[in-house]
């Protein structure tokens, strides 16, 4: 008897990191290759707000993703090389080689804010999904992201209002 592999939800987001707002969302059933979701999420995020630096984890390291960010969207890419121990001469791709030479931990560390977004959503709204069907699950996640953005905007507005009142 073979066991079917349990499929889970995989969420890819594009976020504006200065204010920690979600600008684009892609939901799918996992496990799945991350590179498939990268172009639509990045293009949608860029249409909402132009990207200055595109930051992704090792799963997004491919020459195509670097080309998309740099040539099409005119943004800097900051994606760490998948195999950092491989010699530079054996790394394929112009932008991947450049990333190996000029990778900045300080800039890449901003990616932790994406994880903060996931953490805040799970803490404030719970990590259990109430929907059963895939379409309902996808909609539930999208609504959670909208609610998260509304919460962030409202708290920054109220926080700014209170600071101006008591300064």
Where are these regions (language model features)?
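Polybasic low-complexity intrinsically disordered regions
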Residues: 1-73, 145
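Catalytic-loop motifs flanking and including active-site residues across diverse enzymes
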Residues: 37, 113, 117, 142
């Amino acid at each position: 008897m073979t066991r079917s592999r349990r499929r889970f939800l995989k969420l890819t987001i594009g976020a504006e990191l200065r204010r920690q707002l979600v600008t684009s969302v892609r939901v799918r059933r996992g496990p799945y290759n991350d590179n498939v979701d990268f172009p639509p999420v990045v293009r949608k995020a860029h249409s909402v707000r132009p990207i200055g630096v595109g930051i992704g984890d090792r799963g997004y390291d491919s020459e195509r993703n670097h080309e998309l960010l740099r040539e099409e969207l005119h943004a800097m890419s900051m994606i760490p090389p998948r195999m950092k121990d491989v010699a530079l001469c054996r790394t394929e791709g112009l932008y991947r080689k450049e990333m190996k030479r000029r990778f900045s931990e300080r800039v890449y560390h901003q990616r932790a804010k994406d994880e903060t977004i996931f953490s805040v959503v799970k803490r404030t709204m719970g990590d259990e999904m109430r929907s059963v069907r895939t379409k309902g699950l996808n909609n539930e996640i999208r609504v959670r992201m909208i609610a998260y953005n509304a919460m962030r905007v409202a708290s920054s507005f109220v926080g700014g209002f209170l600071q101006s009142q008591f300064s």
